[in-house]
Amino acid sequence: MCQETPPRPRAPSRWTPALLALLALGGAGLCHASSQPGYHARPSARNKNWCAYIVNKNVSCTVQEGSESFIQAQYNCPWNQMPCPSALVYRVNFRPRFVTRYKIVTQLEWRCCPGFRGPDCQEGPKDHMKTPRPPSARPKNNLKKATDTDPSQVSQPKKTLSPTNAVEPGQVADAKQGPPELQQSKVQVLEEKVVRLTRMVLDLQSTVVGLKENLKHTIQDDGRKEPDSWLGPLHPQPTPDSPLAGDAEPSQLPGIPSSKESGMKDIKSELAEVKDTLKTKSDKLEELDGKVKGYEGQLKQLQEAAQGPTVTMTTNELYQAYVDSKIDALREELMEGMDRKLADLKNTCEYKLVGLQQQCDDYGSSYLGVIELIGEKEASLKKDIADLRAQLQDPVAQPSCCNGQKSSDFGPQIKALDQKIERVAEATRMLNGRLDNEFDRLSVPEPDADFDARWTELDARINVTEKNAEEHCFYIEETLRGTINGEVDDLRKLLNEKIHSLEDRLGIVLQAANSSDVELTPMGPALPEQPGAENEQVLMELSRLKDKVQVVEDFCLQSLPHGIDGALPSVEDLTHVSLSLLESLNDTMHRQFQETSHSIQKLQEDVNALHSQLNHSECTGTYLQNGVSDSRTGDSMEASGFTKTGEQERTVGTVPSPGTPAAPCCGQLEERWQKLQNQMLAELDTCKESAHGVQSGVSAIEGRVFQLEQTCRRLDTISGSLQRIKEGLGKHVGSLWNCIRQMNGTLKSHSRDISGLKNSVQQFYSHVFQISTDLQDLVKFQPSATEEPSEATEGPSGKTPLESTRPSEEAPTEPPRLTPLPEDPAGPPQTGQQPVLPQRPLQPPPLPAWPGRTGLPFLPGSSGVIMETGEAGPPGRMGVSGRGLPRGVDGQMGQGPIHSSEGYAGAPGYPKSPPVTTPGVPLPTLVSFSAGLTQKPFPSDGGVVLFNKVLVNDGDVYNPNTGIFTAPYDGRYLITATLTPERDTYVEAVLSVSNASVAQLHTAGYRREFLEYHRPPGAVHTCGGPGAFHLIVHLKAGDGVNVVVTGGRLAHTDFDEMYSTFSGVFLYPFLSHL
């Protein structure tokens, strides 16, 4: 709905009559805001002192800006029911909202042509007219000058002279024109056009006179109509194809008289005043409308603040937000619970480890005490046995009187005892070794050991112990209950028997007492002789019986109220009895241990006594041996004859006989040896019992050691399987690394090939660009020979002044099209180019590889240089380019000095020389980078974004620590960046090149001034999606490129996910260096 006119770049020759007609009528004012002279009228146009220029104009447009809600009242009436109920239904509907916007359009405006000046553009550069001119007044602008706020400022084109007073074309021509034949032909053409246009102007003047005559009648008839309708016949309606736009106003020609000119001027002045008034009113209305809209916006904000925030999200977004919040809360709760659980488990493990360490220390100390005790006992036993063995060896070796059958029986027993003691000592040593190993293992807790199995084993053992204790308690309780019940039953039976016996005896006594008087005489012999003593005895017996009966009665009376069950002990009593029994068992075991220790001490004392007795026996044996030796000497003396009666008697009286004095000694020794044997047997039984207890403990320890060995074997198997798994994983990882190395090598080779292809393509592009530049130069230097006579006003030696003042405007705006390469790969590659001037081949270009290049670009990886020489092609056919120049299509860079229907064959091209590297310019290499953001980009609210995750960094041109890409070469670079804000926020960023802003980005969109939008301050920012930079920039070597965030919040995650990226690639070097 924009009120605009399509722009026209320039008025062609076929529009000249229409332009002249509109000029004759006065023309219509056109908008001339910010005029830009870009083009001028053709030289053959009539009245060349006025020219149409292209200008820009601000126009107002009504555009749709969203929608607004309104409440609509509806009657809830059924179909065909005339008496409709009065109940109204209010519904909320939406309608589009339109606002007024401004835009810039391009239109035409009349101004003085170049070379003309003056108020009416009638003064030319060399205007020496001798004929007088009538005064030509500048057409007045009847409309009021527009203010700055009015975008449609109107200006009228100037009036032109009559055809009779027009300046001839030959008067404006320059003296340095072409030959007279061309000028004469051009003048003839112009004269014909002037005659034709003069005839058309006369017809238009007659039409205007008729219109003015009809104006008088129209004003009289339609005086009550609006003033705008009065000028309806005078305003020509613009058409879409019309070169002009706007309201046309009538203009009086100077040669035509009018009687109503003053009235028309008054009407125009009144119309202008009315328009000004309406414009003022409309401005005020617009201002008032803006204020009302501002007040409405403020009222809406107040209502929203009073009612609370309105829901602007959809149902799915609300559900998604609710689910996200719940998931976040659940995640936080799970993490907190896991942290607490881990902390509790850690504390529990530490507490259990401390308890286990303490328990191991206690076990170690107790085991050490047992080891010391056993060692002491073993040492003492070894010492005693050694002493006993040393004492027994000497008497056994010497012959004595006691060597008999019993001594021969006592030797094997002593040997058996020694063997048993040896076995006990060996078992004790083995037990000590095992205990030492166990203490060494338990004293130092293993940090990597798995205590779960041990805790499980301890729990199982504790459970088994508790179960056994409970079963034992139940067994003791049942046993005690049965025993107590049996004892009570026996007691009751015994009491009943005694009571029955007492009753019987009492009955007998009473019966005897009663019958004592009647049967006194027959019983007299049976009674004792003393009646007093008998009575006393009976009374004593009766009193004793009474006492017993009283005791039994008291006992029965005490047990009767409680019944039989009352006499039984309760569970607590039984438990107490069980505890007392256990304590008694423990005391018994302790007492037995003490008794064992006492018996061992007693055994030691007996051994000492035996030692002393053996010493005494040895003394006795020595005495007996001396006596035997004396008796032998006595016999020898008696045999030799030296006998004396007194000496023989003394010898016989002194030396006892072998039978008489030796018998009591041997009897005492036999008794002592019997006592010693009995004592040793008793001690041996005690040692056996102790050995059985130790053996049971050793068997328990062996069972535990066996369980540990089984657990270790299982752990060994598990560790072996884990080792095999580890080895398999190591082999698999090694194979994967080998594959990765192979892939890296393949990628490197592919990268080299791609880089070679890329360099070749860049070199080909540079060659094509150079060829297009050469073609443009050729087009500029070639003369034109196909223009019409009306346009061929310039000679081969120069141009007209008008064209010399604007050399840049005559250049073609589009580059010439290049002939594509032949598709046949077998044929020689040729490039269709423009023929050059004759002088151009004499001066080789600075880079001769491009004009005469006939080969294809370098292939990747080729190291050699292809040297080819262009051959002369066949004659080319006539081809017309954009500027009318002939061109040999099939020939190569040949010469075309003569314009004919058929071109000559092209000359051979220049041989290709190797490219010359510009000194001081490094050869470009592969440069590209790509990085993403996975962490917080900067510590503060804004700054340079540090894209930390580098994906590609060829050439090491990007520094993730600073977030800056440094260009290594001069050339063109493609820079891209994608920035994603957090939800419900925005991001405002700048792409900076060498600390200079190149592009800006705001994800919420660009925001204009509030005066233009009529929005109140404090409007809410509209959040948008991600934003991106994507542009090609020219960078010099050493320039730094980075992304700077100036507002908002940039999204980042902690899970190695990229939402924002920054990339760049080197396209090609700067063309001036190639």
UniProtKB/Swiss-Prot annotation:
Organism from which the protein derives: Mus musculus (Mouse)
Top-level taxon: Eukaryota
For bias type Basic and acidic residues, the affected ranges are 219-228
Q: Which residues form a coiled coil?
A: 181-218, 259-345, 374-394, 533-554, 582-620
Localization per record: Secreted, Extracellular space, Extracellular matrix
Q: Does the keyword Isomerase apply?
A: no
Domain C1q, by residue range, is: 922-1073
Where in the chain are disulfide-linked cysteines found?
51-113, 77-84, 112-121
Give the protein's recorded name. Answer: EMILIN-2
- Major place of residence: secreted
Q: Where is the signal peptide?
A: 1-33
Cross-referenced PROSITE patterns: C1Q, EMI
* Domain named Collagen-like: residues: 852-913
Residues annotated as transmembrane:
none
Name the GO cellular-component terms.
Answer: collagen trimer; collagen-containing extracellular matrix; EMILIN complex; extracellular region
| Tissue specificity note | Highest levels are present in cochlea of P8 pups, followed by modest levels in adult heart and lung, and much lower levels in forebrain, brainstem, cerebellum and hypothalamus. Very low levels detected in muscle, liver, kidney and eye.
Q: Any idea where the EMI domain is? A: 47-123
Where are the compositionally biased (Pro residues) regions? Answer: 813-828
What does the UniProt function comment say about this protein?
Answer: May be responsible for anchoring smooth muscle cells to elastic fibers, and may be involved not only in the formation of the elastic fiber, but also in the processes that regulate vessel assembly. Has cell adhesive capacity. Major component of the cochlear basilar membrane (BM) which may contribute to the developmental assembly or function of the BM.
State where composition is biased (Polar residues): 149-165
Q: Which Pfam families match?
A: C1q (PF00386), EMI (PF07546)
List the carbohydrate attachment sites. Answer: 58, 463, 514, 586, 615, 744, 995
Q: Which PANTHER family match?
A: EMILIN ELASTIN MICROFIBRIL INTERFACE-LOCATED PROTEIN ELASTIN MICROFIBRIL INTERFACER, EMILIN-2
Its GO biological process annotations read: cell adhesion mediated by integrin; negative regulation of cell migration; positive regulation of angiogenesis; positive regulation of apoptotic process; positive regulation of blood coagulation; positive regulation of defense response to bacterium; positive regulation of platelet aggregation; regulation of blood pressure
* Name of the coding gene: Emilin2
Q: Which UniProt keywords apply?
A: Cell adhesion, Coiled coil, Collagen, Disulfide bond, Extracellular matrix, Glycoprotein, Phosphoprotein, Secreted, Signal
Annotated region (Disordered), positions in chain = 121-184, 219-264, 627-661, 783-865, 893-917
Describe the subunit structure: Homotrimer associated through a moderately stable interaction of the C-terminal globular C1q domains, allowing the nucleation of the triple helix and then a further quaternary assembly to higher-order polymers via intermolecular disulfide bonds. Interacts with EMILIN1.
